[in-house]
Amino acid sequence: MILGVNIRNFDVFEDDTIGLLIEDSGKYVGKSREDNGIRLRNLNALIGRNNTGKSAFIRALSYVKRSLVTDVAKASTTDNRPGFMNLLIDKNKPCEFRIFFRIRDQKTGHSEFLQYELTIGASEYGSPYIECEKVLSSVKNEDGSLLIKEVYENSSEARLISDEKVTALSVLGKLNGSESEIRQVFEEIDGWFFCAFSAEESSDYYSAGNAPGAHKHLNSDGSNVGNVLDYIKSLGEGEYESLMNEINSKIPALRKKKKNLPLNLQGSPEKLFKYLLLLRDPHPKTTIFIETPDRDLYHDMVDVLADDMREFTLNHPYSQIIFSTHNPYIVEAMSPKEIWVFSRDFEDNDDAVRIRCAGSDPVVMALFEQGVGMGAIWYGGHLDQGSSEYDEDGVNNAH
């Protein structure tokens, strides 16, 4: 799972961090996993007004995965991206991504803390190339302090991969002889799933590359749901019936209510069905990214989805969900430490993105500890003000 991300000079992000990076991890030595400060958690909500960077954050991480699956040049023009130079804020500087993970070691079962760093520069012709890649490991010493060691570095001066557009991680991560940390980071990013069930325009089934027959996993827009159900049915009629009964029992008055819903909500039961099916995949994704999963869902369906997302993260402690929303209902039962507020001052010349954790605001924490739900706190305007920022110790860091 992702503990933190830093993005520099890419899209709307000049130098912005969400969560915890490896260089700051030493301050949390000795604390329990549930209480180790302001970091991304198993369930995370991105909130804020329109055009504040929530969708851009998800798109930026989609770009990282696409760079690994294909290469940095193709990633810059697929998924409606406008080309690499148009993704840079400062055309004379590279963009950089730093992503800090907590990953389960498949052999020992223990947590590994690893950071992947990717720097992409532009040639004189504006085409992207890999300037530097690193994998760092955070290791606890006998005295309890943390040692940060470099597992791998691939720079333009000492490249192992001849194609400068291809990431070394995408090659070495598939080799059994590579360092285990490299394979773990690759598998973690390769397991990201960018869910578009609630997208305003879904891809056509065949143009999305689907084929008839049984499919093990849902695709990004859920258009192959029938194929996935065929696969589950092939495993055994009893297993199929059990899954269908469980999911259908969670969808409120599925057939009755649908007749009386407004037109834009009549697809809600099917949309909720896809989410519930995704969350029951026996081989869960490492991180599921969803933009506005509550879009067009009836309010009681939002409650069902929120409960099931929570249950997913409890059942899969090394997986996580990161979603954006404008709906207070879906965050009502969440913790302030699971909510990230994006803001921008459009009256300022640089209209820079600012990201803060709701759990770093002592006023919000006090309200939450008194029993006020996060949806009510948000509806009351306590999350949108953004007039001051606090660190986890309650120190005001506003400039």
Language-model features: where?
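Switch/communication elements of ASCE P-loop NTPase nucleotide-binding domains
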Residues: 1-67, 257-399
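Hydrophobic residues positioned within well-ordered beta-strands of beta-sheet architectures
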Residues: 3, 16, 97-99, 114-116, ...
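Short polybasic amphipathic segments
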Residues: 5, 97-99, 127-139, 259-260, ...
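Short acidic, glycine-rich loop/turn motifs
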Residues: 7-9, 99-108, 137-139, 346
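Conserved P-loop NTP-binding catalytic core
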Residues: 39-43, 49, 56-123
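Short glycine-/polar-rich loops that comprise or flank the Walker A/P-loop
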Residues: 95-97, 190-191, 335-338
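Electropositive, glycine-dotted interaction segments
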Residues: 107-250
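Oxyanion-binding "anion nests"
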Residues: 253
